[in-house]
Amino acid sequence: MRPEAQTGHLPVSQSPAVHLPVLYTQVLEGLRVIENGRYLDGTFGRGGHARGVLTQLGPEGRLLVMDKDPEAIAVAERDFAPDPRVSIFRGSFAQLLQWDATAEGLDGVLFDLGVSSPQLDVAERGFSFGKDGPLDMRMDPDSGESAAQWINRVEEREIADVLWTYGEERQSRRIARAIVARREKQPFSRTAELAELIASVMPRGKDKIHPATRSFQAIRIHINRELADLEAGLDAAVERLKPGGRLAVISFHSLEDRIVKQYMNRLAKAPPANRRLPEAVAFVPTLDLIGGAIKATDEELAANPRARSAVLRVAQKREADA
């Protein structure tokens, strides 16, 4: 029986204007939602996946939603707070252990990594090189320094290291040198200024992506501590999962996916034996992998080109005696 028949209210998932998020069907299949379960959406965004979970929860089920972005939390409070099954927390999923509501354990956890479409589409958020706006890039605009503050402050070497480490940008040193030379004349304040500068110093090639793509990605990841938060969030999620609970993670670039894949493999598979080392304690797996890398179907890609780089990985926490 669906929630509306049991709780007397129409769930937010019934809104006809809702656009399905990336890998919607695959996420719900991966989480394997049970009616009375407790689930955490650690990256609420605009609530697309959360709506799907709610359609499969009964009146005793619970959905906990988190997001760093105050605009996302405002949407959650507007559209989801009236539902008694929903609890809302503003913060990074790396902080989920600090939320008392997670202490009872979770039957499923979802992380949909990276920047959301609303963040990219609104120029004032400062994430997009294609739309001029303040050079900000913070997912939580009330916390930390903006991209402009960082890029106008740090040394050339740090800029180059960030572009290489988080963007795998081969021209990182050339771009960093140009950034420092430009800011000595006039500090950066707009996304268009940075994007145009990067484009002006990049060698012409056959690459179809915008010249600033990797640099903007790298700066955004650094400003928001995305990879550090991911590592902490994975640990916290597994700690809170009940035996049999599932962890589903959507990543959008190789750096994220590599961390997720290696983390799940490390908890699911015994490391190779090394005869040079003393015999180790017997490996006890914590997770079981549920399939491999899951990608968007051709049908979804036709409707949503942004899904082309999305990769979903799912793992299940083992029973204590498994």
From Swiss-Prot:
Residues noted as binding S-adenosyl-L-methionine in the record, renumbered to the chain: 47-49, 67, 93, 112, 119
Pfam families, per the entry: Methyltransf_5
Catalysed reactions, semicolon-separated: cytidine(1402) in 16S rRNA + S-adenosyl-L-methionine = N(4)-methylcytidine(1402) in 16S rRNA + S-adenosyl-L-homocysteine + H(+)
Cytoplasm is among the record's keywords: yes
Gene Ontology molecular-function annotations: rRNA (cytosine-N4-)-methyltransferase activity
Documented EC number(s): 2.1.1.199
Role this protein plays: Specifically methylates the N4 position of cytidine in position 1402 (C1402) of 16S rRNA.
Name under which the protein is recorded: Ribosomal RNA small subunit methyltransferase H
Native source organism of the sequence: Stenotrophomonas maltophilia (strain K279a)
Lineage of the organism: Bacteria, Pseudomonadati, Pseudomonadota, Gammaproteobacteria, Lysobacterales
